[in-house]
A protein has these predicted regions:
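Extracellular/periplasmic metallocenter environments
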Residues: 35, 82-117
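Sec/Tat signal peptide C-region and signal peptidase I cleavage site
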Residues: 23-29
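N-terminal edge beta-strand
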Residues: 30-53
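Bacterial N-terminal signal peptides that target proteins for export
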Residues: 2-13
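Short beta-strand/loop motifs in extracellular/secreted proteins, especially
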Residues: 56, 66-68, 110-112
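Asparagine-centered strand-capping/turn motif at beta-strand->loop junctions
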Residues: 60-62
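Beta-strand-rich interaction surfaces with strong enrichment in secreted/lumenal proteins
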Residues: 46-48, 76-80, 90
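Bacterial N-terminal signal peptides
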Residues: 11-22
């Protein structure tokens, strides 16, 4: 009897763990994806448009030879990308509106807008 209860507890524990993992998986996925390029310290497209109230995967390609840092004080986002590399990160969900972002290392020339519709 003791062995049956122990086996049952292990089975229930494994099922609960699988249920928890499967619930967490959708949180890792983005509801939308966009691409962003930085070249000559300028972001393209500018403005970047994304849907409101949606988790968005951003793929950022740095075509410069120097490191850039995608940064926004408006929505508290940031991501470092070395020269010639591509990184992905998530932003949102954000409310509808216009937000600013820039390259932290070249803020004065790299300001861009994020339009959330």
């Amino acid at each position: 009897m003791q062995l049956r209860i122990s086996s049952l507890v292990k089975t229930v524990s494994a099922a609960a763990a699988l249920a928890f993992i499967s619930m967490a998986q959708p949180a890792l996925a983005a509801d939308a994806e966009v691409s962003l390029v930085i070249k000559d310290h300028l972001f393209t497209p500018n403005p970047l448009e994304i849907p409101a109230d949606t988790k968005v995967k951003v793929t950022l390609e740095n075509r410069d030879q120097t490191t850039a840092e995608f940064m926004s004080d408006d929505f508290k986002g940031g991501k470092l990308v070395t020269g010639g590399k591509t990184v992905s990160f998530f932003i949102g969900p954000l409310k509808a509106g216009t937000y600013e972002f820039h390259d932290e290392y070249k803020e004065s020339i790299s300001k861009a807008r994020l339009i959330v519709k």
